[in-house]
């Protein structure tokens, strides 16, 4: 479920340009236990709620704002068709840009990494292999093809294929995860150059 702020363009300006928390934030709510009943006990749900906010910025003190913004998101959930959520919460975890930066080393807590616009999406993101420096590879949400966990996995697959090609590793055109469990199938013919990898989340 997506709840879009009444003034969506203003909401985007607050995130991208003004670097402030919106009084009317857009939110995304997912209940994964609807399709996977192993995620919660019978009759209960797991809710994932995303409220896009600015990256770490002096305008937002998350130590001071965390609780109030969390309450604001709960109120937005009622507008999106989820009334009385507060009284039914048994466990919750609030993750802010400070947490993404401090605990998970996501630069400035920006989970979408580069600007999330058409000029910095898909093939317009930095490539997975440096063109100017031999043996340097990038992987993560800041590289091609973009952010979001499934897409970051694809970035890892692209970068690992490029690395293996450069190392002269023979791999089938299409392979499963079982391929890597049997190390005898991996044959390194030669190493063309030293390699390094950098995670860019």
PLM feature spans:
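A conserved FAD-binding loop/helix module that cradles the flavin
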Residues: 141-164
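Flexible loop/turn segments at secondary-structure boundaries
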Residues: 35-38, 55-58, 97-98, 144-147
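Mid-domain catalytic core of redox enzymes
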Residues: 1-40, 179-184
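Generic recognition of stable, solvent-exposed alpha-helical segments in well-folded globular domains
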Residues: 24, 64, 68-72, 106, ...
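Conserved FAD/dinucleotide-binding core of flavoprotein oxidoreductases
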Residues: 41-76
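Active-site-proximal substrate-binding core of FAD-dependent oxidoreductases
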Residues: 164-199
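A glycine-rich dinucleotide-binding beta-alpha-beta segment and adjacent secondary-structure elements
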Residues: 22-30, 75, 79, 83-145
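Short glycine/proline-enriched loop/turn "hinge" motifs that connect secondary-structure elements
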Residues: 37-44, 127-132
């Amino acid at each position: 479920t997506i709840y879009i702020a009444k003034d969506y363009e203003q909401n985007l300006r607050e995130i991208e340009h003004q670097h402030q928390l919106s009084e009317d934030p857009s939110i995304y709510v997912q209940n994964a236990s609807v399709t996977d009943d192993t995620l919660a006990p019978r009759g209960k749900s797991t809710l994932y709620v995303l409220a896009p906010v600015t990256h770490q910025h002096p305008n937002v003190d998350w130590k001071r704002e965390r609780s109030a913004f969390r309450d604001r998101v709960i109120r937005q959930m009622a507008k999106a068709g989820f009334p009385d959520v507060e009284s039914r919460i048994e466990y919750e975890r609030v993750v802010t840009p400070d947490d993404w930066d401090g605990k998970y080393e996501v630069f400035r807590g920006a989970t979408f990494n580069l600007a999330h616009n058409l000029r910095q999406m898909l093939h317009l993101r930095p490539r997975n292999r440096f063109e100017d420096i031999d043996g340097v590879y990038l992987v993560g949400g800041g590289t091609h093809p973009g952010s979001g966990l499934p897409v970051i996995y694809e970035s890892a697959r692209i970068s690992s294929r490029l690395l293996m090609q450069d190392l002269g590793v023979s791999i089938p055109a299409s392979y499963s995860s079982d391929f890597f469990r049997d190390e005898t199938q991996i044959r390194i013919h030669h190493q063309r150059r030293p390699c390094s990898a950098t995670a860019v989340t």
